[in-house]
């Protein structure tokens, strides 16, 4: 969510060997690795490896921490691509995929989108704080120490929260699983729903239309995260502080928009269908990118602030639909 800070640092402090144009693909590669690996991970952890979800999340955390730690010893630009762009993000996917599946099983259908929205908004909370954190650490401790500190933060927060996620029933002893289901029969949450991979859905053309839309939206969402900070500094000639504020303003609206669009998708009394809500998010974010950034040849600060807030709100809420 805050890779633009590192991107600018790599370009202004060229201490590594290699082609520095490659640093621009790290942010996009990280998104691509996560999005492309998640369908396979979802399929594996839905049923076959459901009891290994916690193990996968712990392994993913360790992989992400080790990847950032290894990146602190990089001597070539491609080392950063391999560690930060590929390995660290695959570790993140190992955490995110089982967590997402568990979330969908322990919440009722009526509130699933809202639950996803609240959970996904956490990444925007982190993305709102990290630009200032990374900028301060890079200015004081330089690159190597910064990524090592970040690896420690990941380890401390992730290992603690992973154990708060309820264990999948297939990993519990039979007696405990029966007691859990019996206790939930009269409760609001209900027993965990058994999930199966809906293979017949692949015969419907609608799923491919949605897949293409998600791919395009996901690819576009990562561009401002990577290049907005550099654009503000090199094209708009804004100060370093202004560039950091733009990236923060890009992330802050997503904190509310995830929950908002999740609520609209869940609300059966709303006049908007789930498809309409997704279209509102996609079309509004697309128009803001064209009108507020694409046609903004002068790169004024006011217009870029408006773009960051508008695009961050509407594009951020797409995942919750």
What are these regions, as identified by a protein language model?
Residues 36-78:
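Conserved MFS/SLC helix-loop-helix module at the cytosolic interface between two early adjacent transmembrane helices
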Residues 64-68, 77-94, 102, 215-216, ...:
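Hydrophobic core of transmembrane alpha-helices in multi-pass small-molecule transporters
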Residues 37-52, 257-272, 292:
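Helix-to-loop junctions at the C-terminal end of transmembrane segments
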Residues 175-210:
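Juxtamembrane intracellular "pre-TM" segments in multi-pass secondary transporters
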Residues 251, 267, 271-321:
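C-terminal transmembrane helical hairpin of 12-TM major facilitator-type secondary transporters
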Residues 6, 10, 85, 92-108, ...:
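Intracellular juxtamembrane helix-capping segments at the cytosolic ends
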Residues 3-10, 199-263, 270, 275, ...:
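Extracytoplasmic gate region of multi-pass secondary transporters
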Residues 112, 119-173:
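Helix-loop-helix hairpin linking two adjacent transmembrane segments in secondary transporters
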